[in-house]
């Protein structure tokens, strides 16, 4: 959408730079201005619709972050690449409600998934006896949202985390 707006501005700039000899009544200029205003209104509607969906999804799962799966089963490195290409991140729940939203996805699919635990995390949800470095250097969550050490070579449900700064 921004590309369309920029294209409209570019056309307007070219028209203004060429002078008005070919459009003495300003019809072309007015047409370009009308088209640009229409695009701005459409962009505002699209942005509003996006924000409505985002807020509804956030409200529904009790978290400002969205956890989405493509239902594929992959190892940690493949997950990292998939999430990055999709514009998301490997899940990293920082609050209990975020972990619950993440666990809801896992429970619906009856699968485990990788997550990333930050060094300065204020929230953790390790299962009893975890972390266990002997099990691996990655972390997975079970269908209840409990965290376990895991091998990064395990193949688990692909879940990516998306959040927006508005």
UniProtKB/Swiss-Prot annotation:
This phospholipase A2 inhibitor binds directly phospholipase A2 in the presence or absence of calcium. Keywords: Calcium, Disulfide bond, Glycoprotein, Lectin, Phospholipase A2 inhibitor, Secreted, Signal. Belongs to the alpha-type phospholipase A2 inhibitor family. This is Phospholipase A2 inhibitor. Homotrimer; non-covalently linked. Glycans are attached at residues 61, 122. Disulfide bonds join 83-160, 138-152. The keyword Glycosyltransferase does not apply. InterPro entries: C-type_lectin-like (IPR001304), C-type_lectin-like/link_sf (IPR016186), C-type_lectin_CS (IPR018378), CTDL_fold (IPR016187). GO terms for molecular function: carbohydrate binding; phospholipase A2 inhibitor activity. It comes from Bothrops erythromelas (Caatinga lance head). Residues 46-161 form the C-type lectin domain. Residues 1-19 form the signal peptide. PROSITE patterns: C_TYPE_LECTIN_1, C_TYPE_LECTIN_2. Expressed by the liver. GO terms for cellular component: extracellular region. It is found in: Secreted.
């Amino acid at each position: 959408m921004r590309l369309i707006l920029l294209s409209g501005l570019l056309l307007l700039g070219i028209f203004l730079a060429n002078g008005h000899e070919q459009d003495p009544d300003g019809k072309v200029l007015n047409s370009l201005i009308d088209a640009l205003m229409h695009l701005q209104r459409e962009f505002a509607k699209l942005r509003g619709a996006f924000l409505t969906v985002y807020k509804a999804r956030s409200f529904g799962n009790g978290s400002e972050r969205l956890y989405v799966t493509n239902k594929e089963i992959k190892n940690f490195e493949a997950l990292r690449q998939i999430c990055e290409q999709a514009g998301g991140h490997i899940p990293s729940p920082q609050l209990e409600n975020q972990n619950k939203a993440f666990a809801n996805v896992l429970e619906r699919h009856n699968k485990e998934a990788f997550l990333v635990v930050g060094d300065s995390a204020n929230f953790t949800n390790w299962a009893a006896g975890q972390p266990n470095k002997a099990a691996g250097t990655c972390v997975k969550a079970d269908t209840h949202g409990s965290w376990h050490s895991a091998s990064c070579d395990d193949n688990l449900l692909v879940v990516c985390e998306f959040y927006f700064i508005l």
